[in-house]
């Protein structure tokens, strides 16, 4: 006989429920929660128990009157004879017991199997009931089937002490849709690859910025905080998935039989035991929400910092850095803590991984506010960039180059400001379906998971200052390695007085037994050491009026604002306005 297979989403739905002492009404929410599903199941059970009492009482009277039992169709018309071995669906349950008799015998008694309320079954007939609409993930156009044998008992699975039932049509919506399964597999692969690449690239970027001391400045400190928030967001997603779905794979869920589903749905665990069992997953979900919020707020900090550099005449970077740090890490902790308190007090059920009514807005409203504010800052900065480009190219005829620069600057700022969040911000994914839903999910999974990778590439690996430091470090390392290699091979270096050259492998010094006959053109030119001293004049040269020449020379100090250098960025001029070259490194990155 057939064996019912339960879909993954329903198994996960019923695997972690905790029934509270007092049921609340099902929230008019955009997400169907586990608690709401359990409430509907128990309400259906209560209605079924009431109906069973009435039907059993009527059936007992019929059997006592020796009128027997005959099945009736859902429309009240006589049912046609059916070919054996075929399933014939009915649109609703039989609620009235007919008095007409074509076939005598004891009927199969109605019962509640923790999923469906089964009606009386006629001997030798297949009973079909619609897939219940109170189970959210069922295919509500299908039917579930049972067979009543000629002895008045529900047919059992051979070799198993359980009732046979066929829920295949109810589960067809989830298990037999290969195309939908491929979509979910593809989405999972996209965000797994994206977050893995982001985590790896951001780790390298943070190590680079932390290793080179010349890169230590306010601008790069803020970059490092944002990189760290992306890393923690990716890591928390992987941890959350591992904790929530560690004991339940999709293949295992699909192998669950109808009997196992009944056991899952029967009695929820006690609240005390459930609280201990859910502690790990609740902590994982809480940290995931916190790091998600901090990531949004550090993206906002980047926008506020760049906006402040442009529009604030007096800007103390060191003082603002502390404020930005508290804002980026502290403010999300406040509203996440409020959400945890409300959830633990009013909706302390399950793993907290699904929304519970309108309590989700405690976290979503601050995040949406940061996205909107950052988008406003983005528009204002793009306006300033366009104005700067027009002023720079005033009097020139090549406007296409101007537009290309503006487009490039805009694309560079898009991942930094998280502009892609605004595309579907006003369209919740639960309100769309079909092709639009697939487009939205692929778009969000792609950009959200790869955003950290794009940010690391643009603001670290493609940064001219970072590349210069890496090249200098590489040159020093190769020179030191070359010097050690030559020292081990026995080579020595020739010297010109106190100076040593590391580029020669020939000993030119007057050492006995080791001198080589060299051409005069290959020998170093003889130099007069006095000619290198200050105040020395060649014989016959005109005398210098001022014979006092300073030993030290004044060299203009590099303020550090040019060429993207960090040196000097954090040196404030007391009481003076911010120097104009302060934006040079930002413009070079953006332009």
Curated annotation (Swiss-Prot):
All disulfide bonds of the chain are 48-117, 108-148, 131-170
Q: How does it sit in the membrane?
A: Multi-pass membrane protein
Source taxon at top rank? Eukaryota
Tissues in which the UniProt entry reports expression: Detected in kidney.
Q: Extracellular face: residue ranges?
A: 27-188, 240-282, 343-361, 429-440
Gene Ontology annotations of biological process type: adenylate cyclase-activating G protein-coupled receptor signaling pathway; bone mineralization; bone resorption; cell maturation; cell population proliferation; cell surface receptor signaling pathway; chondrocyte differentiation; in utero embryonic development
Is ATP-binding tagged as a keyword? no
| Residue spans of biased composition, Basic and acidic residues class | 81-96
Q: What does this protein do?
A: G-protein-coupled receptor for parathyroid hormone (PTH) and for parathyroid hormone-related peptide (PTHLH). Ligand binding causes a conformation change that triggers signaling via guanine nucleotide-binding proteins (G proteins) and modulates the activity of downstream effectors, such as adenylate cyclase (cAMP). PTH1R is coupled to G(s) G alpha proteins and mediates activation of adenylate cyclase activity. PTHLH dissociates from PTH1R more rapidly than PTH; as consequence, the cAMP response induced by PTHLH decays faster than the response induced by PTH.
Q: What is this protein called?
A: Parathyroid hormone/parathyroid hormone-related peptide receptor
